[in-house]
Amino acid sequence: MTWADEVLAGHPFVVAHRGASAARPEHTLAAYDLALKEGADGVECDVRLTRDGHLVCVHDRRLDRTSTGAGLVSTMTLAQLRELEYGAWHDSWRPDGSHGDTSLLTLDALVSLVLDWHRPVKIFVETKHPVRYGSLVENKLLALLHRFGIAAPASADRSRAVVMSFSAAAVWRIRRAAPLLPTVLLGKTPRYLTSSAATAVGATAVGPSLPALKEYPQLVDRSAAQGRAVYCWNVDEYEDIDFCREVGVAWIGTHHPGRTKAWLEDGRANGTTR
């Protein structure tokens, strides 16, 4: 089913933002495993490069907020990062490990989990910029996707991977090197996402924050007229889920994939948009 088909059905896809990150520590195997079990249609992650060139799933430049360590991700090796714990800060964490695996998650491990799942799931990978290693991030990402056989899909609609960034240059690098990979240009203002930026870099979708989309809901129709879908992120409240469905958002990024999926399914079963 294409993005357009899903929108016409009145039922956006649900993307687990950093996994089921309300219930489990973000960017951990525990969070993604729960998201998949809850029926997420896609999972989202942020990636950063380690000092020795490995892609790891960490949002912040620094380790302080989500790990037992401190300092910059980019200055540490994979081995050093693996010595840290990434779940102790979260309310769900238990000393006996019953909360699930909250060790460092590499992109390799996450892609393996998604591709081995018993149903098709997309993985949305966000590259962070500006960073120490610049375009090497996209080069490493494309090499990894090629290794898994998902960098050159038969069509954008059938792609198992989607690459996103707030950096227009990063989106352009992906489009130039892998033209069939879907890409999302992220932004926090409707002015930016309705400018020529998305067209200039060939983005197949735009990704407004929820406040940006609420400020200018016409962004969905304007994007559709240009052949682009809309991915809206941090959509957690029921009224906001309904809003996204009503304006035609294709993908909803949420910290609560299970309840979001259930809310959408219930609305479709009842033939309502609430």
Curated annotation (Swiss-Prot):
Alphabetic keyword roster: Calcium, Glycerol metabolism, Hydrolase, Metal-binding
Gene3D superfamilies with a match to the protein in the record: Phosphatidylinositol (PI) phosphodiesterase (3.20.20.190)
Note: Was identified as a high-confidence drug target.
Cofactor or coenzyme needed: Ca(2+)
Domain spans labelled GP-PDE: 12-264
Organismal lineage: Bacteria, Bacillati, Actinomycetota, Actinomycetes, Mycobacteriales
Annotated PANTHER family: GLYCEROPHOSPHODIESTER PHOSPHODIESTERASE 1-RELATED (PTHR46211:SF13), GLYCEROPHOSPHORYL DIESTER PHOSPHODIESTERASE (PTHR46211)
Cofactor: how and how many bound: Binds 1 Ca(2+) ion per subunit.
Source organism superkingdom: Bacteria
Active site residues according to the UniProt entry: H17, H59
Catalytic EC class: hydrolase
Role noted for this protein: Glycerophosphodiester phosphodiesterase hydrolyzes glycerophosphodiesters into glycerol-3-phosphate (G3P) and the corresponding alcohol.
Keyword Phosphoprotein recorded: no
A GO BP entry: glycerol metabolic process
Cited InterPro entries: GP_PDE_dom, PLC-like_Pdiesterase_TIM-brl
GO molecular function, a single term: glycerophosphodiester phosphodiesterase activity
Record: residues binding Ca(2+): E44, D46, E126
Gene assigned in the entry: glpQ1
Induction: A possible member of the dormancy regulon. Induced in response to reduced oxygen tension (hypoxia). It is hoped that this regulon will give insight into the latent, or dormant phase of infection.
Enzyme Commission (EC) number: 3.1.4.46
Name of the protein in its database record: Probable glycerophosphodiester phosphodiesterase 1
Family of this protein: Belongs to the glycerophosphoryl diester phosphodiesterase family.
UniProt keyword annotation of Calcium present: yes
Reaction catalysis annotation: a sn-glycero-3-phosphodiester + H2O = an alcohol + sn-glycerol 3-phosphate + H(+)
